Design a protein with these regions (language model features):
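Sec-dependent N-terminal signal peptides
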Residues: 4-13
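N-terminal soluble domains immediately following signal/targeting peptides that reside
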Residues: 18-167
Length: 167
């Protein structure tokens, strides 16, 4: 009985030492407006680890008066490697419209709002969200997709990093 209690205690303390590896993404496209918008919610410690290899770095200072002059460029370089949206097999070049921070400490999130005007009739949309899968084997990325009047939610990760919708 005592050995089982110790084993349970050790296994639960190990589980508590591993944080939840998760990002949220909402993709919206309404053909009447010809606008693609993407909202990403990423934990700031994960962003810092991906960009400057230090989760608690204050070097980039996102959304602060002393934000590093290359912070947006570094962020977009990373996102362009691990995240994209394609219409009819053509990658859409997203641009940062705004960013904001929410939460405190390890729970501080960096919200990134990206947009791009797009024209034409679309038959397919492909999404890749492999953000932080280069750093964490257990990273999961939840994606909510809204196209005109249809919605879908998917979970992407290291093994399955892309998803295709056909209209």
């Amino acid at each position: 009985m005592y050995k089982w209690f110790i084993a349970l205690l050790l296994s639960s303390s190990v589980a508590l030492a591993h944080p939840l590896r998760l990002s949220l993404c909402e993709i919206e496209f309404y053909s009447k407006e010809n606008l693609l918008s993407v909202n990403l919610k990423l934990f700031l410690t994960d962003v810092n680890e991906a960009l400057v290899f230090d989760p608690y770095s204050k070097e980039l200072a996102f959304c602060q008066p002393n934000e590093h002059s290359d912070a947006d460029k570094m962020l977009m370089d990373y996102l362009n490697r691990f995240f994209y949206v394609k219409f009819n097999k053509k990658k859409i070049g997203l641009e940062i419209k705004k960013k904001k921070l929410s939460g405190q400490g390890d729970n501080t999130a960096l919200w990134i709002y990206l947009e791009k005007s797009v024209e034409g009739k679309f038959d397919s949309m492909e999404i890749k969200n492999a953000v932080f899968t280069d750093l964490f084997y257990d990273q999961n990325n939840i994606v909510y997709i809204h196209v005109n009047d249809k919605s879908k939610s998917i979970m992407l990760n290291k093994e399955t990093s892309t998803y295709e919708l056909n209209f």
